Design a protein with these regions (language model features):
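Active-site helical microenvironments for divalent-metal-assisted chemistry
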Residues: 1-287
Length: 287
């Protein structure tokens, strides 16, 4: 169906608005560089002193390896591995995972050999970093295959689960800053994220990361649809939120009367989940 001139203008305006939002987010310090050495150290308060010293050495190595390199947002490149490490610190991952996050791009982007990492940080950390680099190769050789095949291959060829966790954190920060890329590259990476990385996060039970990857991917690939559903959800939220709270309290009262100590929470479906359900059932939002 051909669009009218007015519809074309509205479509272009809406897409421009969403692309501007993506770019603004990507270039902001809060998103592009959310973590620095000081805040990372604070987030790693669960580690002991020896482990923190090793993490600090990994950071210094990464800072030197990426010296002079910059992200497309203009931020020093080291802000990216710091952000990836910050995601894993929030998950209370072990110090080897944090070190690998800080070092995850030095093999590909800085011309450093794996043997150097082995000598500097041990074989365990070097293997994680090497595994993260190899995951990208697995994707490139499996791009034409079904998404599920890639997921199975990634899981099967990765002996250490921490490799996948570092890669997911890497993809999450890249998706948060995807607005710095040109439109075609944005859409390709966002499509990869929806097809491959979000399902892997789901397989691992990492629901919060899965949802964020899906939302970021959805609004990048389908900005107009994301906007329409987002506005519809906002318009309906008031009444539905009150109804959900009423139902929650009723269930809680019944449980209490039966002597069952429980916590009842309500959960709103996120935009991509609503979209996939509408698409599968061929229904509109109102249905």
């Amino acid at each position: 169906m051909r669009l009218s001139a007015l519809e074309m203008i509205e479509k272009t305006t809406s897409e421009s608005y969403f692309q501007a939002q993506l770019a603004a987010r990507a270039f902001s310090d809060e998103i592009a560089a959310p973590t620095n050495a000081k805040t990372l150290t604070k987030a790693l308060s669960y580690l002991n002193r020896r482990e923190l010293r090793r993490v600090r050495r990994a950071y210094q190595f990464a800072e030197e390896a990426h010296d002079g390199q910059r992200r497309l947002s203009g931020h020093p490149y080291v802000t990216h591995p710091l952000a990836v490490a910050g995601v894993l610190a929030d998950m209370h991952m072990d110090h080897q995972s944090i070190m690998a996050a800080l070092l995850h791009d030095v093999l590909e982007d800085s011309g450093i050999d794996k043997e150097v990492l082995v000598e500097s940080f041990g074989e365990e950390v070097a293997d994680i970093v090497d595994g993260v680099s190899k995951l990208a190769t697995i994707y490139k050789t499996s791009a034409e295959e079904h998404a599920e095949n890639f997921q199975k291959m990634a899981m099967a060829t990765t002996q250490d689960l921490r490799v996948i966790l570092v890669k997911l954190a890497d993809r999450l920060h890249n998706m948060r800053t995807i607005g710095a890329l040109d439109r075609d590259k944005r859409r390709r990476i966002a499509r990869e994220t929806l097809d491959f990385y979000a399902p892997i996060a789901n397989r691992l039970g990492m629901n919060a990361i899965k949802i964020e990857l899906e939302e970021l991917g959805f609004e990048t690939v389908y900005p107009l649809r994301a906007g329409l559903i987002g506005r519809a959800v906002s318009a309906a939220r008031g009444n539905r939120k009150a109804l959900m709270e009423e139902i929650r309290k009723s269930i809680l009262a019944v449980l209490k009367r039966e002597g069952i100590d429980a916590t009842v929470v309500g959960r709103e479906k996120h935009l991509y989940s609503i979209y996939t359900k509408m698409k599968a059932q061929r229904k509109s939002f109102g249905d």
